[in-house]
Amino acid sequence: MKRFFRLSAALAALALLSGCASLLHPRLVEDLQLIQTIGFDGGIGDMTVSVSSGEASEDAVSAQLAARGASIQTAVQRLQDFSPREELFFAHIRYAAVGEDCARGGITPILDYFERGTQTQLSVPLFVVKGESAYTLIAANGGENEITAALSSLEADTKRQGSAHCFTVLEIASRLNRSGAARACAIAPPAPERSVPEAEDGATLALEAGYAVFRGETLCGFLDTDAALGADLLLGFAPQASYVLPDGSGGTVTVQLHTAKASLSPVRNGGEAAVRIAVRVRAGVTESSGADTADAAMLARLEEELSRAVTAQIEAAAEASRTLDADFLELWRVLPEVKGEGVLASLRTLVQTESVLERSYDIYGSAHGKEESEHG
């Protein structure tokens, strides 16, 4: 399988960057147009590159530019013709976006561009624009609703809410190299029926839309919210997600995850193989409509409900992995034969979840909600 990330090339790039000061000619800052967001559309032989310079300051002009070329590099060179400044500067790119059609055609050229570039950085988060082109998103977000600000806000929100992880170019390339599959944070404009009071004159803001899944270099599908959170729980991205649980008397109790730890182990029975997934989550009660969460029986009931919800999310992630035939859960680590053709599609997963609920100001001894299911 083609390697998506070459250590030797990365080391060479680092060597170049360590001496970049001697390679750059002195230039006035006011002559530079700093690019903060870059977008990619099209495919091999016909690439469109869109860029945004970020929020404008009092003495600077925010610019959104786009150009086509036979490759990313030629499109980038053509961008210079449209720049109001003397030179475009790409060393401060904060975000990258790929249109859905471009992602379905393959992202190897994009990963290669970031890997080899002397100005580009591998630590840049890479988003997939679901159902749209990157050009549409960047061009529609200008002025006060500039795309860089929108993506910065989205990144901060996902970290705070635990709703997604913004995978970087390096993380995506590394996972493709070792697992043949990877995820990227998916974004989408709000649907027409969804009002965004903060938006002005129909501005298109970027909303988190689960995960895009890559098998090899190509986009093969998307994960919905439940499957996305289930994958995060398994892969150690400790979320701070909230769950609204029924209290059994018509009310609800809201809890927020504190920690989530997962362990995977192989299960072999004759010629059949499965993966056992054991998850332990700790959560805190943040809101109640009236239930006595100090009551041991109520606490045990809520733990059972939380276990049921977490189990369903992990099952959704495992089912998506089978359906897409993409091992983005990295099950091969405990069951190497998963890398064999057709093995993943028929792999069974056994999910066991243990939940512990606590209150920040008074931790109670609790019965642990457990639920085990077999799915496959």
Where are the language model's segments positioned?
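Membrane-proximal alpha-helical signals and transmembrane carboxylates
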Residues: K2-A9, L17-G376
